[in-house]
UniProtKB/Swiss-Prot annotation:
Free-text function comment from the UniProt entry: Involved in targeting and insertion of nascent membrane proteins into the cytoplasmic membrane. Acts as a receptor for the complex formed by the signal recognition particle (SRP) and the ribosome-nascent chain (RNC).
Species of origin: Deinococcus radiodurans (strain ATCC 13939 / DSM 20539 / JCM 16871 / CCUG 27074 / LMG 4051 / NBRC 15346 / NCIMB 9279 / VKM B-1422 / R1)
Main location: membrane
Identification of the protein by name: Signal recognition particle receptor FtsY
GO cellular component: cytoplasm; plasma membrane
């Protein structure tokens, strides 16, 4: 099964949430918007899918001002633009160009990627999948088991490392995460490894001391390897919906994010949460996940996502 087919299948719950409550999407925009109940149904469907009230209002206004042809086509266009954090790229999309530029954006700017997120989002497994993704594209990879507070985390990453043939820098359970990060950053620099993924503890976003520790980890990485980490990626579980967005805001305040990885999109009807993440943080979504297999985590592309959401085939190359 192709990635697009897996994505389409994984977004089925969100698709049902929107199509089941939005009313008929195959009617003309001008016809649909003559009835207030059609507009209200569409608003309700988008908000229920966790698109967010502010983004929903913008989408409705966009359709009202610019929408021609079928309502579904206008809705897809408006959603695609909402998912573009880069205004220039959004303009290209609007003009009808669809260059595959968003996929190239997943190449890390530097050599160290700090991966953060609360417990239960699949952070350690996501790191393993990311490692495999970049190895398959010719990059050398290292892992740092910086989640020293969760007893099994280091062991789990170690098992993944053995399976993938990736070196793993580990500390002791309950040890200093910053020390692990410092040693790993120094080792990566000495060995000339292309990419180091630093796992971190599953921090609760309402615990000030844990957020402060994140800042410390970032500082010591920079001390061991100046200019790093060039990337800080937050892993979010799509099932958490709006609560996940609040998590993202707290993490972004503590240590500015450069990207978000959204997992478990196949387990929720709230796939619309991607819209407020991009809109309110201005941070790109790097990867999305719709399953347990390594190939079920792939670079995010807004046009591909929206087409899969509405079960519309990709245009022929």
């Amino acid at each position: 099964m192709s990635w697009f087919d897996r994505l389409r299948q994984g977004l089925s719950k969100t698709r049902q949430q929107i199509s089941g409550t939005a009313g008929p999407l195959d009617q003309e925009v001008q016809t649909a918007f003559t009835r207030i109940d059609n507009i209200e149904d569409l608003e309700y469907a988008l908000i229920a899918a966790d698109v967010g009230r502010a983004a929903t209002e913008e989408i409705i206004e966009d359709i009202r001002k610019n929408g021609e042809g079928r309502l579904q086509d206008a809705l897809m266009r408006a959603l695609t633009l909402q998912l573009e954090p880069n205004a220039r790229r959004a303009q290209f999309r609007e003009l009808g160009f669809s260059p595959d530029v968003s996929r190239s954006k997943v190449d890390p700017k530097g050599h160290v990627v700090m991966v953060i997120g609360v417990n239960g989002v699949g952070k350690t497994t996501t790191i393993a999948k990311l490692g495999q993704y970049y190895m398959e594209r010719g990059q050398s990879v290292m892992f740092a088991a910086g989640d020293t507070f969760r007893a099994a985390a280091g062991t789990q990453l170690g098992v993944w490392g053995e399976r993938l043939g990736v070196p793993v820098i580990q500390g002791v359970d309950g040890g200093d995460p910053a020390a692990v990060a410092f040693d790993a950053a120094g080792a990566r620099k000495a060995r000339g490894t292309d990419l180091l993924f630093v796992d971190t503890a599953g921090r609760l976003h309402n615990k000030h001391n844990l957020m402060e520790e994140l800042k410390k980890v970032r500082r010591v990485i920079d001390k061991a390897d100046p200019g790093e980490p060039a990337e800080v990626w937050l892993v979010l579980d799509a099932v958490t919906g709006q609560n996940g967005l609040q998590q993202a805001k707290k993490f972004h305040e503590a240590t500015p994010l450069t990207g978000v990885v959204v997992t478990k999109l196949d387990g929720t009807a709230k796939g619309g949460i991607l819209v407020p993440i991009v809109r309110e943080l201005g941070v790109p979504i790097k990867f999305i996940g719709v399953g347990e297999q390594p190939g079920d985590l792939q670079p995010f592309d807004s046009q591909e996502f929206v087409r899969a959401l509405f079960d519309v085939e990709l245009p022929k190359a």
